[in-house]
Amino acid sequence: MSFKPLHDRIAIKPIEHEEKTKGGIIIPDTAKEKPMQGEIVAVGNGVRNKKGEIHPLELKVGDKVLYGKWAGTEIEIKGEKLIVMKESDVFGIIN
């Protein structure tokens, strides 16, 4: 991937949920909820404070995270769908 987020932004590859219910019913795209789990594929350098110092982000590439249903902006890079959002939009890291 050739995308580098700026400042306190991160790029997440959403983890898709099952497209079929346990009973075998196929869920159409229009009825699916936006994924709320993903893997971080790129991070920005960090946030600059009032003194001009850069504080690096806590999240790193490879972290699996939970984020808000409507957080971020969807983009497509080389056919891969990503969501770009601020680090503060992430609820936490999944272990």
UniProtKB/Swiss-Prot annotation:
| Listed GO biological process terms | chaperone cofactor-dependent protein refolding
Keywords (alphabetical) are: Chaperone, Cytoplasm
Compartments annotated for it: namely:
Cytoplasm
Q: Which SMART domains match?
A: Cpn10
Has keyword Chaperone?
yes
Q: What does this protein do?
A: Together with the chaperonin GroEL, plays an essential role in assisting protein folding. The GroEL-GroES system forms a nano-cage that allows encapsulation of the non-native substrate proteins and provides a physical environment optimized to promote and accelerate protein folding. GroES binds to the apical surface of the GroEL ring, thereby capping the opening of the GroEL channel.
Family statement? Belongs to the GroES chaperonin family.
Oligomeric form and interacting partners = Heptamer of 7 subunits arranged in a ring. Interacts with the chaperonin GroEL.
Would you tell me the protein name for this molecule?
Co-chaperonin GroES
**Which species is this record about?**
Rickettsia akari (strain Hartford)
